Amino acid sequence: MTRGRVIQVMGPVVDVKFENGHLPAIYNALKIQHKARNENEVDIDLTLEVALHLGDDTVRTIAMASTDGLIRGMEVIDTGAPISVPVGEVTLGRVFNVLGEPIDLEGDIPADARRDPIHRPAPKFEELATEVEILETGIKVVDLLAPYIKGGKIGLFGGAGVGKTVLIQELIHNIAQEHGGISVFAGVGERTREGNDLYHEMKDSGVISKTAMVFGQMNEPPGARMRVALTGLTMAEYFRDEQGQDVLLFIDNIFRFTQAGSEVSALLGRMPSAVGYQPTLATEMGQLQERITSTAKGSITSIQAIYVPADDYTDPAPATTFSHLDATTNLERKLAEMGIYPAVDPLASTSRALAPEIVGEEHYQVARKVQQTLQRYKELQDIIAILGMDELSDEDKLVVHRARRIQFFLSQNFHVAEQFTGQPGSYVPVKETVRGFKEILEGKYDHLPEDAFRLVGRIEEVVEKAKAMGVEV
């Protein structure tokens, strides 16, 4: 282990000088461990990551925790390898920080646990799986209109309080229950309170045992927020490559990854690019996203919450992310206000998998007809608001009649919300979803009341609900 000394501290950026011309490699982890000698000093156990080489013997590094108490001249040890984090079964049900240290007060990780470096190349071309396979989620609106691809990347857009977290939890639950799959949750620049709430909600709903969680909260230095997504990804890669699993990787929020990179870039002295972002924005995003893929062994499907600054979709941060996405799930506040959960906008959500050669001709035609019906209903809403239903043609009245039933049938109860609603959740296979909507479009259930379609699973449940309401079926 080669030793060096701190020669400069600039917030989260630390310069270290090594003797005898030794220069640690880029991305190497350096350790500073210092015991307080008097009451004016603090105990320090800090990890730095090498970012730049300055001359023959000096490196500029990014701190993974606060640099409070660092003094010039402190000893630094080169570990000779990048930051490495625990992987495998030991991570399930646990909460970690960027360095792979447990932060859930549930005890230490076994010393003999396998650890993998967080910086790794993306899978080679010949290792990639080429066939497109749909990931069934059991959530009707997603499976019908914006299906997820195994090994794909999904963007989840939504403001506060429209149900992003509940949708994420339900996806984790369904993948664990129906597919026996593993989930990894990476909280990037998260509010600590939200991360804490999510952890306890997952404990209560019983999905924590199939989940590993990694957090780099808002209050942490930019180095931690920039690398925590890679920590989560490394844990997910182990389950894909070594165990052949289909893994779900949640990143909340991918914008904070870019934001942290921008802060670090400025501190490293790089010339800023458009809108003040780092010049390496596309490269950093590509290095992360290219590792999220399907291989012949297994897949990592990622669902990324995306914050759009000032609702400007042309901002370089969201615009760079969009180019990597296979599907988008847009949550709409108006639908949440109507009590339609999940509040997924059926017209704004998209997926490249919604094509006849991938989902099949019947599924494709039903999905497109559902969207056409809802789009026509949307166009008619202004007329209805001003003149009322009576002024519509018979054809348009039928469109509205069916569109409202479709809109309500796109809602369903979630397993993870059962403790709040008192209603059991439903998992609906894709075939059942397509059949249900096809029959509604054919007018088979025009005689049933709208409320019978609200928050149910399969189409048979609509009939049962209508019977319970005293309607002749």
UniProtKB/Swiss-Prot annotation:
Cellular component GO terms held in the UniProt record: plasma membrane; proton-transporting ATP synthase complex
Keyword Transmembrane helix tagged: no
Catalytic activity: ATP + H2O + 4 H(+)(in) = ADP + phosphate + 5 H(+)(out)
Ion transport is among the record's keywords: yes
PROSITE patterns: ATPASE_ALPHA_BETA
Membrane topology: Peripheral membrane protein
One Pfam family linked to the record: ATP-synt_ab
Keywords on record: ATP synthesis, ATP-binding, Cell membrane, CF(1), Hydrogen ion transport, Ion transport, Membrane, Nucleotide-binding, Translocase, Transport
InterPro entries on file: AAA+_ATPase, ATP-synt_VA_C, ATP_synth_F1_bsu, ATPase_a/bsu_AS, ATPase_alpha/beta_chains, ATPase_F1/V1/A1_a/bsu_N, ATPase_F1/V1/A1_a/bsu_N_sf, ATPase_F1/V1/A1_a/bsu_nucl-bd
Domain of life: Bacteria
HAMAP family, alphabetized: ATP_synth_beta_bact
Function: Produces ATP from ADP in the presence of a proton gradient across the membrane. The catalytic sites are hosted primarily by the beta subunits.
Family of this protein: Belongs to the ATPase alpha/beta chains family.
Subunit structure: F-type ATPases have 2 components, CF(1) - the catalytic core - and CF(0) - the membrane proton channel. CF(1) has five subunits: alpha(3), beta(3), gamma(1), delta(1), epsilon(1). CF(0) has three main subunits: a(1), b(2) and c(9-12). The alpha and beta chains form an alternating ring which encloses part of the gamma chain. CF(1) is attached to CF(0) by a central stalk formed by the gamma and epsilon chains, while a peripheral stalk is formed by the delta and b chains.
Name of protein: ATP synthase subunit beta
Taxonomic placement: Bacteria, Bacillati, Bacillota, Bacilli, Bacillales
